[in-house]
Amino acid sequence: CQNECCGISSLRERNYCANLVCINCFCQGRTYKICRCFFSIHAIR
């Protein structure tokens, strides 16, 4: 869930993140979004 393009669609982000819960997200520069992530089997949203 790191280095995603900023402004990525929520659906694609859910697919990309799979079972990761991402917090403290911020954009670095104009291209990448950095997140702190942790694994969770309950992250099915």
From Swiss-Prot:
Subcellular locations according to the entry: Secreted
Highest taxon of source: Eukaryota
Protein name per its UniProtKB record: Putative potassium channel blocker
Keywords associated with the record: Ion channel impairing toxin, Neurotoxin, Potassium channel impairing toxin, Secreted, Toxin
Tissue specificity note: Expressed by the venom gland.
One GO cellular component, as annotated: extracellular region
The protein's role, per its UniProt record: Inhibits potassium channels.
